[in-house]
Amino acid sequence: MSEKSQWGSKLGFILASAGSAIGLGAVWKFPYMTAANGGGGFLLVFLISTILIGFPLLLAEFALGRSAGVSAIKTFGKLGKNNKYNFIGWIGAFALFILLSFYSVIGGWILVYLGIEFGKLFQLGGTGDYAQLFTSIISNPAIALGAQAAFILLNIFIVSRGVQKGIERASKVMMPLLFIIFVVIIGRSLSLPNAMEGVLYFLKPDFSKLTSTGLLYALGQSFFALSLGVTAMLTYASYLDKKTNLVQSGISIVAMTISVSIMAGLALFPAMSAFNIQSEGGPSLLFIVLPQLFDKMPFGTIFYILFLLLFLFATVTSSVVMLEINVGNITNQDNSKRAKWSVILGLLTFVFGIPSALSYGVMAEVHILGKTFFDAMDFLVSNLLMPFGALCLSLFTGYIFKKAPAMEELHLDERAWKQGLFQVWLFLLRFVIPIIIIVVFIAQFM
């Protein structure tokens, strides 16, 4: 008899779900969008939109996943009593397969830099020009592909061990370490001269800087930041027992995700202000700007290694769910088939990701609609598949998913005031969230 995957504890579910949401964007993009768009004003808009958009969508994925208790691609057909709805699950499966194929490229770069920095600790070589070093790494086919393969192997190892022994155990180690490293780096960053100028630059409200672009980013980020629209949270919820309170768990996950984004800014901007270093975030921040910054500090190599580990943990806890969902889809969450399909899907992901890994080297001149293969895949997932998936998920939950099981899953069927909250949740899913998703989607092409 096949053994269905399940969480060993509520804490494991919360940490794994938060880890899924806390990806590279939360650490190297969100703080810069915050600072550039009015600091505290942007944060306020983001918090409000997360409550009105992200949190309701998160609860929708949780309710759907636990109610169905099957793989993501079968969830919608089962709950909608018609297999035609399974296309929503396939959107997520396709998006996450593509996402892991290029996400693993960045994960590989982090592994390479960790090796370089550990080598510096033992005086096994210097680095010199960091911009030149980064270019030499990403343009070298052997290094790029080898690093990508190593990162995918790490994901295969974790996912093949199962939900409890693999994903949950890894999350219970990586997520606390991520927060501990953040505290250490924030403490060091705030101890530097002129650190408070960086804090004010990051957090001081200035609504005059909150542009329409920034406003739309805050709205979009409210569901992107929680890995919504690609059935990641739905899949994790399908492994839950019926006792776990989904609303309380959702609040914890949202709080952790927002906290990490704010902590990233507190770690970065005070140090950058102290040494008068500028950056717009993204890969250049981690691989060029930060090593230059830490070179100016006592024990800088150690602090940079901690920062790289922080990014690695954020990357791995996000990437394992990308592989896990499709392993669950193919095996129908049967653990006896998990190891074999983890390897097969990992290899397929690596092969599909080869053009992305080579996009900064031998395939740099290969373009799709004016974009490198890496950027084209990023655009396909982030700008097309995720918004469309979130829209379909919102409409399915609002109009197709039966009210009774939804209320039961969310524990909002007991008292009148809870039933009132359920009606508000349903209204948001039916009307408010779809309109906002459509507006954000159209605005990106204008």
Residue ranges and their predicted role:
Residues 2-3, 7, 168, 172-316, ...:
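Membrane-embedded translocation segments of transport machinery
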Residues 1-28, 57-62, 66-79, 83-90, ...:
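Membrane-interface "cap" regions at the ends of multi-pass membrane proteins
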Residues 2-4, 32-37, 70-91, 104-164, ...:
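Inter-helical loop and helix-membrane interface segments of multi-pass membrane transporters/permeases
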Residues 4, 74, 107-138, 239-243, ...:
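Helix-loop-helix connectors at the membrane interface of multi-pass transporters/channels
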Residues 145, 372-395, 418-446:
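A generic transmembrane alpha-helix motif of multi-pass inner-membrane proteins
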Residues 12-49, 231-237, 247-251, 255-256, ...:
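Transmembrane helix-boundary motif of multi-pass solute transporters/channels
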Residues 12-14, 20, 145-146, 256-262, ...:
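Loop-to-transmembrane helix boundary motifs in multi-pass membrane proteins
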Residues 6-17, 42-45, 84-97, 146-149, ...:
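Select transmembrane alpha-helical segments in multipass membrane proteins
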